[in-house]
Amino acid sequence: MTNIRKTHPLMKIMNSSFIDLPAPSNISSWWNFGSLLGACLAIQIITGLFLAMHYTADTTTAFSSVTHICRDVNHGWIIRYIHANGASMFFLCLFIHVGRGMYYGSFTMLETWNIGIILLFTVMATAFMGYVLPWGQMSFWGATVITNLLSAIPYIGTVLVEWIWGGFSVDKATLTRFFAFHFILPFIIAALVMVHLLFLHETGSNNPLGISSDSDKIPFHPYYTMKDLLGLLFFLILHLTLVLFSPDLLGDPDNYTPANPLSTPPHIKPEWYFLFAYAILRSIPNKLGGVMALVLSILILTFIPMLQTTKQRSMLFRPLSQILFWILTADLFILTWIGAQQVEYPFITIGQMASILYFSIILIIMPTVSLMENKMLKW
């Protein structure tokens, strides 16, 4: 009798994706972050659903409803903090996942890479809109500042901003539509994840060596299901430690003050995972230039496959490229730090230098160094 998982129309798809999937035998723990992102998405959708049952998307009651969730709803406080810190864990896994793709040359799988970039933009949009919902000071002013950037678009900018706001300022209409989008986008993300996996399974996974693994495959289950479960265990330990011991560590104290359009916080800044892009935005004195740099800071990932000059796919045996990769990582840490600082000397200068370095490494230095490595290896 044939196994049901190989014949049933639905189970057949699951089987070929997660059980009998031929996987390279040498993929390391850096490949765990894909499954962790799936776990993050599931956690966010489930906790978000329970929060939406008690939340009210109205400017007069939004802040109170979040307080009500934390004080009066059974286990509401932990659901709220799992959701809020889940976003931070989501982005931590996302950044590592993208970094791994750059390091080991996974960007050569063009469809998978480009869908991944679309996913990154969608997750960023979802997180931004979610940050507005508690209707605290930083929620309100963050929404005002970031949406106002669209007014830099020539000719249609002002109309576009007022259209997004649903009026002449961030108000009830804005909050209602942001809640609607914040609710629907995770399901769109889930659909995009399916497309991401579809394209990934067309080519098969990359591996640390960056060479074809067709001659040495192992079934996904039990080897990588166990490995992913171990990764998930470590992830949950870190996540729950954050939730139970320091739930407000990554948040902003200003968001515990109800939104007040008449009082501007001394320093408007987004959540930590947007700070690097925010620092790049602020490092350019011109508004339109800043917005373009902000978009390019993520969109630049689409250029990486076109800028690849190396004959080796992975950076595993390319020490110069490795050094550059870690300089780029350090540069992103510096940009994140600068994004959280006041707009004053010396932070302005440091931010500008770090922004120039960020674009230079990706667009100029890395392709040049890769050509040098080809010469050194006589390729």
Swiss-Prot record:
Highest taxon in the source lineage: Eukaryota
Transmembrane intervals: 33-53, 77-98, 113-133, 178-198, 226-246, 288-308, 320-340, 347-367
The keyword Transmembrane helix appears for this protein: yes
GO BP annotations listed: mitochondrial electron transport, ubiquinol to cytochrome c
GO cellular-component term (any): mitochondrial inner membrane
Molecular functions (GO terms): metal ion binding; ubiquinol-cytochrome-c reductase activity
Disulfide bond annotation, renumbered to this chain: none
Residues that hold heme b b562 according to the record: 83, 182
Positions with a binding annotation for heme b b566: 97, 196
Main location: mitochondrion
Subcellular location: Mitochondrion inner membrane
UniProt cross-references to InterPro entries, sorted A to Z: Cyt_b/b6_C, Cyt_b/b6_C_sf, Cyt_b/b6_N, Cytb/b6-like_sf, Cytochrome_b, Cytochrome_b_C_euk/bac, Cytochrome_b_N_euk/bac, Di-haem_cyt_TM
Binding-site residues, a ubiquinone: 201
Keyword Iron: yes
Keywords recorded for this protein, A-Z: Electron transport, Heme, Iron, Membrane, Metal-binding, Mitochondrion, Mitochondrion inner membrane, Respiratory chain, Transmembrane, Transmembrane helix, Transport, Ubiquinone
Subunit structure: The cytochrome bc1 complex contains 11 subunits: 3 respiratory subunits (MT-CYB, CYC1 and UQCRFS1), 2 core proteins (UQCRC1 and UQCRC2) and 6 low-molecular weight proteins (UQCRH/QCR6, UQCRB/QCR7, UQCRQ/QCR8, UQCR10/QCR9, UQCR11/QCR10 and a cleavage product of UQCRFS1). This cytochrome bc1 complex then forms a dimer.
Note, other: Heme 1 (or BL or b562) is low-potential and absorbs at about 562 nm, and heme 2 (or BH or b566) is high-potential and absorbs at about 566 nm.
Protein known as: Cytochrome b
